Amino acid sequence: MKFVDEATIEVIAGKGGNGVASFRREKFIPRGGPDGGDGGRGGSIFAVADRNINTLIDFRYARLHRAKNGENGRGSDQYGAAAPDITLRVPVGTVVHDADTGEVLFDLNRHGETVTLAAGGQGGMGNIHFKSSVNRAPRQWTPGKEGEQRRLRLELKVLADVGLLGLPNAGKSTLISRISNARPKIADYPFTTLHPNLGVVRTSPSRSFVVADIPGLIEGASEGAGLGHLFLRHLARTRVLLHLVDVSSPDPDADPIESAVENARAIVEELRRYDPELAEKPRWLVLNKLDMVPDPASVQQRFCEAFGWTGPVFCISGLNGEGTQELIWALQDYLDAEKRKEQITQDKADGSYVHEDPRFDTTRDAPPSGKD
């Protein structure tokens, strides 16, 4: 299925049905009084996040979504039927913008989360509501209200814990296929990856995290060169970025460190130009393709010194898996710690956080022994 992460749609909710002016007409009841019913509510349009959907391709072709109008009221105090609602299913991680103002209206980042895109119009009132002690035969009624109408831009930002960053052919797809069940296309030419790939890394039956692989960045990506800039938004929700650097060289006479450092600096600069906040995310350095390097320890030391890197660094081979287990467990421990911090922050905001004082321990007394 083709990956589509942007779409513009128009949603038109249904108009409410009109109320009616009607009077009771029965034999031997000459003055039956008003009995006009209300109009039905117009259909609303909702969006619900569905984890079983991973693309907005359905909205690329179905751009207009219109709900039906409510039925008009009738005599004998009969209310018009409400129109059925429309529910649009979108991927988890979809951001809904107002297409005209650019305002962010909704961010659906939880499975099952439901929002109202356009509310249906309220039905009009029948003349039964206008009866009073001084007006026993009202002829007033109100029309139904118009439903909401909006132009919306849907933008998908995939939900992942870890984002892979690097030049084309840095080994990102090889790494994600090594550590997860994702099977992206892998080949020895640039831009093999044409859309984001997600892989679930499971370290135990109860512990896992999600990795996102996007097309590689090239110099000038922030200005539209290559494909990577189209998908950098998918790294916005990640907790940590893995910057993959190819430290091998096809030319045995060339110094691979010099070109690797130059390429790594270009990636960081493109990241800063695209989004300074994204550039400030925690970033780990991953030196890849060490199976093609005679002295990995020396390469790591020389690269970090030349690059001026003091953060976390890992040396791996995505091809044979060397060093990947250490990377996986380090990521899992880091992500678990970050999630605990976020939970504590949320609990404090909700007022439900209970501080545990290590000076006080709770112990259970031994049960009393039976009588002799």
UniProtKB/Swiss-Prot annotation:
Belongs to the TRAFAC class OBG-HflX-like GTPase superfamily. OBG GTPase family. It comes from the Bacteria. Disulfide bonds: none annotated. GO terms for cellular component: cytoplasm. Its cofactor is Mg(2+). Residues 1-159 form the Obg domain. One of its GO terms (biological process) is ribosome biogenesis. GO terms for molecular function: GTP binding; GTPase activity; magnesium ion binding. It is an enzyme of class 3 (hydrolase). This is GTPase Obg. Its main location: cytoplasm. Mg(2+) binds at residues 173, 193. Monomer. It is found in: Cytoplasm. GTP binds at residues 166-173, 191-195, 213-216, 288-291, 317-319. It comes from Bordetella avium (strain 197N). Coiled coil: none annotated. It holds the Pfam family MMR_HSR1.
